């Protein structure tokens, strides 16, 4: 990321006149204040293509993967929404069945609608003292999977908006026992890996796909998110295909 930022900074200071998008032409007079508009560019020589990364963006994503200890990591410029849509689409065939935590983000419901899925909902436990939804019960996950062998993936949100973390390791083991992947919406937990004071990231607990919103808890601009592919239970080829569909082209 340091190299990418430096290259953008250097290009912004150059005297190249941009006969390309975006329409502001890197002209700082277009916007009041100190917004670094000169670093806002399109796919030009030296800056790679996010959907077919071979250079500086591939290098940055590989560095991200090493930092989080994943099989592959991908940037999402459409927030965690694109990551969630991608993860579900790559894990469950159109019209298939999925086990979903009822307190999930609306992007999950959008994926269910778009892919015409048949969802089974698992409700979180209640924390009556705090008046909020609690974690997802491992035993309930196991029961639903035993009762319905046609379920193709499990999806939970951990941490929730209230900071509740489920037992990802045990839920992952339950899913894997039935030969299916666990998708974790970890949008609010991108910071977990950087301190022992935080819970352990789902990427380190056996989840197969983990989606994080860097802009929620890390110093990143709005919409910045990542999708971590952590195992071979979900096709990398399908992840790449659906990211290309759901992200801006």
PLM regions with names:
Residues 1-55:
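N-terminal "arm"/small-domain region of PLP-dependent enzymes with the aminotransferase-like
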Residues 36-79, 103:
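Conserved N-terminal alpha-helix of the aminotransferase class I/II PLP-enzyme fold
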Residues 4-11, 30-33, 67-70, 80-249:
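Conserved PLP-enzyme active-site core in the AAT-like
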